[in-house]
């Protein structure tokens, strides 16, 4: 019987952590078709988070001091994981009961399997489903196909949100960067490099988006911007075309973040360094007038 290790990092989340823990621990067919190992690493919470975690059947660890991001905890979890396959969860993710049992049949053949997911936007109350359609119920990606997609910062192709991934223990040797402590771009490139993968065409977890998400945090966006530029430089000799495309898209992402946060001066600055297309042109024009309408009606960022 296969064992699944789930690595969950936490910090000051006592209002939501019980629901997250229960959604992982109460998976369909657990102890019948697979074993489950839930590893929780807390980043020195000062609320009731740890108290709640310790009421559950989990392996618990804590960082020695607050690190300001999840990556140190993820690496601790990887070190202590003993499963055949590994998932990484965020503290505000909620798993559907059939998540593992839907992914497991494909894990033996493919080193990386992903799925679709639900997005619950707690800020603007606009919910959505991110899932691909395929008559077979899954989509196969050739060796290095998803690596190239990630390197180019393309939104097409396989879904690679961290919470959607289950991967083989053979890939646990790849660890997360701890200098910035929160960025996963280089880690995704490492695990998908020279690997084939599969995506299940089902939404199997809920990704909550709100003002506290790192993806909408200014400090995180700054770290992600500079670390992404540093990361793509390493691949320039082998993939020059893809790196040039990534550079433009990284600047475009930076521009849209400032657009979303109403800093239109910086938004214009970064739009001018991003891809030259109609979408960028209209975004740039709307920084002068119409941005509120755009933000209400389109998914600008995230």
Residue ranges: model-predicted function:
Residues 13-28:
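Short, well-formed alpha-helical segments that are part of the catalytic scaffolds
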């Amino acid at each position: 019987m296969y064992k699944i290790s789930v690595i969950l990092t936490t910090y000051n989340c006592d209002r939501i952590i019980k629901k997250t823990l229960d959604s992982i621990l109460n998976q369909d067919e657990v102890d019948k078709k697979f074993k489950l190992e839930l590893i929780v690493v807390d980043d020195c919470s000062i609320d009731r988070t740890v108290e709640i975690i310790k009421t559950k059947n989990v392996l618990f660890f804590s960082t020695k001091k607050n690190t300001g991001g999840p990556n140190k905890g993820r690496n601790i979890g990887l070190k202590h994981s003993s499963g055949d396959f590994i998932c990484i969860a965020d503290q505000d993710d909620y798993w559907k009961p059939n998540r593992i049992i839907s992914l497991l049949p494909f894990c033996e053949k493919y080193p990386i399997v992903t799925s679709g997911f639900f997005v619950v936007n707690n800020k603007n109350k606009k919910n959505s489903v991110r899932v691909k359609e395929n008559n077979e119920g899954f989509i196969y990606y050739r060796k290095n196909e998803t690596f190239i997609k990630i390197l180019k910062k393309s939104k097409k192709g396989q879904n690679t949100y961290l919470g959607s991934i289950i991967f083989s223990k053979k890939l646990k040797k790849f660890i997360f960067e701890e200098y910035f402590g929160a960025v996963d771009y280089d880690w995704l490139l490492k695990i998908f490099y020279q690997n084939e993968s599969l995506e299940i065409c089902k939404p199997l977890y809920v990704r909550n988006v709100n003002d506290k998400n790192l993806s909408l945090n200014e400090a995180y966006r700054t770290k992600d911007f500079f670390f992404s530029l540093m990361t793509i430089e390493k691949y320039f000799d082998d993939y020059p075309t893809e790196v040039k495309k990534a550079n433009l898209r990284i600047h475009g992402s930076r521009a849209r973040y400032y657009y979303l946060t109403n800093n239109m001066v910086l938004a214009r600055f970064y739009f001018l360094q991003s891809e030259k297309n109609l979408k960028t042109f209209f975004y740039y024009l709307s920084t002068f007038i119409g941005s509120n309408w755009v933000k209400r009606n389109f998914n600008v960022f995230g």
